[in-house]
Amino acid sequence: MGDTRRRLAMAQWDVFSSRQLEGNSLAVFFDGRGLTDVDMQSIAREMNLSETTFILPRDAAIERERGIRVRIFTVQEELPFAGHPTLGTAFALRGESGAQQVTLELNVGKVPVHFEDNAGEPPLGEMTQIDPTFLIQHNREAVAQATGISIQEFDESVPIETVSTGVPFTVTPLKSLAVIQNLQLDAAGAAEYLAKSSSKFFYFVTRETVDRNARLHARMLFYNGEDPATGSAAGCAAAWMVAHGVAQPDERVMIEQGVEMKRPSRIFVRAAHRDNRVVNVRVGGHSVEIIRGEVFL
């Protein structure tokens, strides 16, 4: 009797890295048509990565007008937007075509990804995120109490601030590399605080870095452990840097993340400043394919 199971073509990419076995892994399914929400969530749990994406092909004319429909799932929930799945999926769709732009339609809306091909370097993809919303600045004592981090370990020269370019992150500056590398987070207290403040996650940053070419060293701890590269949070950090003088408008700077996990990632960010507003947030990086195969359902 023949095998009647459905075969789903997929690939796994290491995102925000030009080297295999580094960066943030992403599973990309090339045709999610016919899958239910429950199917997609179950497959994402099976992949057990930070995120899994499902491409939903449709008429070419619609794709030209609205972008290629993509849905993003963590092991626990669907997300309206996330940076490394957007970049990695765009790389997977681009393939070897050399296309200069791939536009995705996510739950948050259209997100274009532009590609740069420079001689002697791997391609770099750069997504344009939604213009940032600066939500609230936080009291350090309240954050210290919620997270279990000593108040002396925060960088007092810049604010703890929730910023959103589609997903709200609380950018939390710490004093030093030693502090961030030895971070012991009260996960339950942090989650309770975030729920009350309408923020999704803390994004911990410090201006002391491992790579002297980096502007920030970052860590993102969440319910699935730790994320080696968080493009949506990096976009919020880009806006925060420009707003508070850590980076100049339109200056492309690098955020290093994932070092503690031995999954070093390099996220390139920039943002503009016009009419007293931070706008045009761009987040980019490299991506490499590491696995290609099929999943049977």
Annotate the PLM regions.
Residues 1-81, 87-297:
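Active-site proximal loop and beta-alpha junction motif in alpha/beta enzyme cores
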